[in-house]
Amino acid sequence: MSKYNLSLNLTVCPFYSIAFLQNQYPLVSSISLSANPDSKTISNIRVVLTADPDVIHEASWDLDFLEPGTGSILLNKSVRISSEYLSGLTEQVEVLLKFEVFSGDELINTVHQSTALMPKNQWAGFNGMPDLLAAFCMPNSEFTEELVRSVSETLSASGLPPQIDGYQSKTRDKPHQMLSALWNVIKSKQISYVNPSPSFATKGQRIRFPDDIKRTPNAACLDLAMLFASAIERMGLNPVVLITREHAFVGAWLIDQCSQFVTNDDPMDLRKKISNQDLIIFETTLAALGSKANFSQAVDSGEVLLSEDQEKDFIFALDIKQARKREIRPIPIYEKPSDEGAVATGVE
């Protein structure tokens, strides 16, 4: 409470990135004012937001007056941050937000809040909007499309129908065949496994995009899980990404369904769907360089990770199709052809 008997209450996201902006998550989700019962009526109120460094457009909120002992929620107004600036970040930037309250020309209160602007490849973890992990599933990247083309060739070489046709067959066999072929394709890329960041599930980590994996080629467990999920979505199937305390792996629906919610923290429910052959999960790190495991062995390993014995480590499963229904879109990646302007790639 300030000496002017006026308090300013804020809800500010502690971290923010292009994924938040792209999917319309507000940086400042609420602003309210309240006056003490013993205060005088305050008139011509304006709340002004500025930032240091100056990376956020100045914003202001107006209120005609505030009676003693009353409060007011200010009209919602989005705080504008340059998408170009957020897309170009390569390191985290700490930003100090300053909210100043004026009555006419008189400054009567100041509140400071901080937020961290993250690089576009940074996921904030389970403690920071876990749904936004779906933004890192990138079905339209060049490497994803390359993988899916190779899946068709692999199916054809095995004497199977080469069409990448999602659930059009109305059987569980064709999705399973596509997933098995995808496993072999990614395994052939000889991607080297690297350790994930400690406690990445709760604190988050940088995620290598598909084209980054192709270039290096290195990947941690979450990178591989999102690479598989990207290709699975590109094939017209519905991927599921599973997160435990120290690991990530992937799965897919064998029928054209999705979970009721974007995230599911009930391993028993997932095991039931697997038992009904509606869902298949597999350990993606076994597709990394040096592993001799086949797809069936990867499936067995995935089911062990979701078993009752491992429940204490399970955090959640992310359903990509349900996320898309909630309009969580992939992070835009801007390509710059030699003779054209920048082009953003995303879900069509």
What is each stretch, according to the model?
Residues 1-348:
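A structural boundary/capping signal
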